[in-house]
Amino acid sequence: MLMDAVDKIGWDGKEFDNIPIDKEFIEDSDVNDHNLALFLYQSGYLTIKGSNPRNYILGIPNTEVRTAMYSQILPRLVKKPYQVVSSNINIIWNSLYEGDVEQAMEGLKALVADTPYSQDNSPKAMEEKFRFIVKNAMHLVGCFVDEEKQTATGRIDLVCRYDTCILVIELKMTENGGLEAAELQISEREYTSPFMAQGKPVYS
């Protein structure tokens, strides 16, 4: 049912947290098959987490719902069968658990490899899509993830905190310089420095 709605209504890969939605719209609408956020609310995937005079603020209620939701959605975003995505997630989890960060990153690369690139999307839009995919993949393996983490020298795309290590991730499409530009930005802006004193190995 969830994936049927995603396919029918469409989804740009943006996060479903802190979404404002008109109070009258949410109260007067029947089951909605045109607005994905409203559909997810009516299906129990989102809940009202706050309000203001005009809007309700929708968000994912808890970790269990987030895990259930994105374990279904990620296969559609990366255009791979559920079994393949599940295998990649298990590789990442096992590798991190065993302390093999390099192998974990290979599993992450395998997960996002061949993800369709739409010519209608700018490099920035595609970077946001990949950031969403990576963020939720890392969430599924048990990381606490900070997105667009602000530091004194810049803003880091993702900081993933695992039990035994911290991963600093910067994402750039080829049009924006790719891996070389991402590594240079991490180095020049010393993105790993703020986390060195936290008692865990820091990788980038």
Language model segments and positions:
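Extended alpha-helical interface modules used as scaffolds for assembling large macromolecular complexes
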Residues: 1-182, 188
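Nucleic-acid nuclease catalytic cores
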Residues: 179-183, 190-204
